[in-house]
């Protein structure tokens, strides 16, 4: 009598085990969902695309969202060992030394200075000093106070922070990405140490007990992509911040608090909302992809418990891919959004297709998955 139950029980146990492994698996994905397929599609789409400029006349040069996408494609190409793709990305960049030199952003604003992360990444790959010479001034001038600085900007500098400090949450990606790259390119601790100190100040000033961040201190809404910049910024900083940095424990604490609460705010289908804590708001792709990148990296780096967070990251990745259309464009991307103390404003933001704000973090997920 016992024998007839034995085989079904074995199959049940095996099925349960396979299902559990599948839920936590960040290596094996079905066809169409692999990071190699997705990364190649979106990278090729980027190579064929036009520049996104800060102003219509190009006065302030390449837009930070394009830089983020370029950086993501380059990191993906390196992780995938795709030398042909690296060369294509380099060929797209090199006119910035010559015919497109006017597109190099001025070193006057946090959103512009982050451009330097891209030539510094090329420098680390090629060892061509042209890229170093282009990139490193963007890191240096973030702490070199210009004569035109306002009183508030000078006050930040006197406290040891960047004169470009605004206490806007997206700053914590823009500052950390360029300072981290400068540290990697030079080996000089001052770059990443000062970025870490800045991050701690932002965490102390802006993070709420639920781990999230208002779009701005006077705008009490947890906007998805705004929080995504913070999640990605902490992730990027922790990737390279030396273990003996005195601020690392505080940053890791803030990161884990955010990830813990994001796990609870994830929608049943795996996405996150345009307003993170409002499940009735529409699912937005750029913020979701940034959160996914932060969690994938946290699991793989050992900052997060694998059993607890791998299913969250995998579910999010699987939910994101259907939002990529046949052309390789990410859909349901919130348009660029300035702060406004009006909840309906965030509900009504236009949703766009193929914007670099959405393309970039998908590529970050791709390289994080295959590194």
Predicted regions and their residues:
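Bacterial Sec-dependent N-terminal signal peptides
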Residues: 1-25
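CBM-like carbohydrate-recognition segments
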Residues: 25-67, 79-86, 95, 104-116, ...
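Long, well-ordered core segments of solenoidal/helical folds
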Residues: 35-54, 84-105, 133-154, 189-212, ...
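Sec/Tat-exported extracytoplasmic proteins
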Residues: 46, 50, 73, 77-80, ...
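Aromatic-lined, polymer-binding surfaces characteristic
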Residues: 60-73, 108-123, 167-172, 176-179, ...
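Extracytoplasmic mature domains of secreted/periplasmic and thylakoid-lumen proteins
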Residues: 105, 109-171
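Short acidic (Asp/Glu) patches
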Residues: 158-162, 216, 343
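Extended ligand-binding clefts on enzyme/binding-domain cores
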Residues: 169-170, 177-275, 281-292, 304-338, ...
